[in-house]
Amino acid sequence: MKHLSDAVFFVCLSICALFSLTLCDGEICQVGNMAIPVGKEQPDPKGCAKYECLSQSNRVLIKKVTCASQALKRGCKSVPGPAGKRFPECCPTTLCRGKQWGQ
C-alpha cells in the first residue's frame, strides 16, 4: 500500500510539473512590431538594447537589457560603440591612459 501511495504521489507531482512548464507555452511578448516567444530574446532594432520574453509565476514578462552607465575614473574616457552593431557590442567602452592608449 505504501508503494501505491508513493506512485500516485509521484504521478501527481509529475503532472503538476508538466502543467507548470507548458502553462506559458506558445505565449508571446509584443514589443512594438516585434513578437518574441517566451524564452527567447531579440535585439532592439532602434537602439542598443535587447528584449527578453520570460515566464515567471504563471506570468509573461518582458525584460529590457541596456548598456550600463559608467562612472569614469580620472584619466579615462568613454568611447561610443560601433554604429550598426547589436547589443552588447554597441555599448560604449571605457579606455584609460596606459595599456589601452599605448602609453
From Swiss-Prot:
Subcellular localization is given as: Secreted
Tissue specificity as recorded in UniProt: Expressed by the venom gland.
Which UniProt keywords are given for this protein, alphabetically ordered? Amidation, Disulfide bond, Secreted, Signal
Q: Name one GO cellular component term.
A: extracellular region
Q: Which Pfam families match?
A: SVWC
Propeptide cleavage-removed residue intervals: 98-103
Sites of the modification Arginine amide?
A: 97
| PTM (free text) | Contains 4 disulfide bonds.
Give the similarity note. Belongs to the scorpion La1-like peptide family.
By what name is this protein known? La1-like protein 15
